[in-house]
Amino acid sequence: MPPKVTSELLRQLRQAMRNSEYVTEPIQAYIIPSGDAHQSEYIAPCDCRRAFVSGFDGSAGTAIITEEHAAMWTDGRYFLQAAKQMDSNWTLMKMGLKDTPTQEDWLVSVLPEGSRVGVDPLIIPTDYWKKMAKVLRSAGHHLIPVKENLVDKIWTDRPERPCKPLLTLGLDYTGISWKDKVADLRLKMAERNVMWFVVTALDEIAWLFNLRGSDVEHNPVFFSYAIIGLETIMLFIDGDRIDAPSVKEHLLLDLGLEAEYRIQVHPYKSILSELKALCADLSPREKVWVSDKASYAVSETIPKDHRCCMPYTPICIAKAVKNSAESEGMRRAHIKDAVALCELFNWLEKEVPKGGVTEISAADKAEEFRRQQADFVDLSFPTISSTGPNGAIIHYAPVPETNRTLSLDEVYLIDSGAQYKDGTTDVTRTMHFGTPTAYEKECFTYVLKGHIAVSAAVFPTGTKGHLLDSFARSALWDSGLDYLHGTGHGVGSFLNVHEGPCGISYKTFSDEPLEAGMIVTDEPGYYEDGAFGIRIENVVLVVPVKTKYNFNNRGSLTFEPLTLVPIQTKMIDVDSLTDKECDWLNNYHLTCRDVIGKELQKQGRQEALEWLIRETQPISKQH
């Protein structure tokens, strides 16, 4: 697929940068981040401004346009994809590589003296603004809020903002009512002497009110803001969806609730004006709590003396620690998901040798099998179905122009997941339908060793995820190999497939200590550009574990795999595994056979059951 031609769009954007209708004085650079007004990773079509301007549609990236240059910063997941999707107007800035300048350093190096750099304050996170403004100011430049989004001005056929119906979740799924969640939040606010809390992240609002939506594809969220006071609840949401009988009943809107649980509903776009009015009535010592990831427009509406900024909100942390109802729901969801994947892999083994299966048809088949499971709602992200060289594109999504046929000669990687009412799944398996080469087996085995090292790890309570990242890379590092993405991310409970604040990574989502009840992925990989990609991913639950000793009474933790899908033994160089690694894999496969076998039997899926039994035969080293 040829890259998008962007010359005319860039000309129009540069013209807008000088247009007095939009800016009081011309700006010399314009920043276009990935996110929306809620700093979401996955966004609605109406918010895909960076993709519209550049052609690059990966989930992470920041574009900066000056009079002379157009540059795109993205991370290692997207280097290959961005290079393919952008035309020659663009310079790709590969984040994480030592020779790549930061965005602010690059701007300082290319801008004329005393330049003005513009950005839409509603879609830029506060922490990003502060960092950028500080560096620019020290070099004699200025970061300017441009309230009219300049991309919107040149995007003539921009889609409408979605406003789809809401889904209510009962206690069987959530384990705790929305009123109790609000009460818990108010306790956290009182501990910090905070009167008000502004909620801007879409998944936090969905979690708090036990509601789900479908405004963003694959992410069960809805466009909204909330302001929680010690005695007030304000919800900012558009459309008549709040008037649906099930939603009114769920939120108790028609009942004469005690005042502190009565929800005041406001239009979505009135958040800044209502927040401004609220702040105007604050007494001198009253504080308003807001995430430093909230937009600059929201945080700047709160006067500095009243503003309390924190990296992670109490909702973010509470949401990450799943209660027993959520953990059980996630277990159920992963059992259903494993059934669908056993069906898929059995089907692929029969059909691939016939030569008619493509990356797209395999992805479609995976969705078809998932849709047969109870409480299926949607996929949790676009399926990464990739064979041969396409597997080396870490976040590859097949399109007709790139769609390869699966064969007996190439490694096949499928990274996929689903949203069920009781949980969110995300699983990657890499397999070969013919005979893998010795090098493919070698690389796969290094990745498997890393996967096992993380999954079997026992670590003290309070350990941060970044300390486990090297466990996953050690076998690869020993051979001079590595991968350019984190090892794991948090996973929501029928919410976003990527969630903070926990994870296993050398960078993102690794700041908060892991604690029992958190759910993360374990997904090391290896990618040979132009040849193949390998990744093995399970979703795992952090659980307590008893150890021989208990230093300082702090306790220990380990991981329970929730994903129960066989790992193809054909791809393993078994003699390179230790006895402990062989035991781990055999025990894992025994659990897959026991748990998923029962469900396959219950659903009458005999062929898939036979496939499961074949794929979970124990391995042993040739001594």
UniProtKB/Swiss-Prot annotation:
One of its GO terms (cellular component) is extracellular exosome. GO terms for molecular function: aminopeptidase activity; manganese ion binding; metalloaminopeptidase activity; protein homodimerization activity. Mn(2+) 1 binds at D415, D426, E537. The modification N6-acetyllysine is found at K304. The keyword Manganese applies. Its EC number is 3.4.11.9. Expressed in all tissues tested, including pancreas, heart, muscle, kidney, liver, lung and brain. Highest levels in pancreas. It is found in: Cytoplasm, Cytosol. GO terms for biological process: bradykinin catabolic process; negative regulation of programmed cell death; proteolysis. Mn(2+) 2 binds at D426, H489, E523, E537. PROSITE patterns: PROLINE_PEPTIDASE. It catalyses: Release of any N-terminal amino acid, including proline, that is linked to proline, even from a dipeptide or tripeptide. CDD domains: APP. Optimum pH is 8.2. Homodimer. Metalloaminopeptidase that catalyzes the removal of a penultimate prolyl residue from the N-termini of peptides, such as Arg-Pro-Pro. Contributes to the degradation of bradykinin. Belongs to the peptidase M24B family. This is Xaa-Pro aminopeptidase 1.
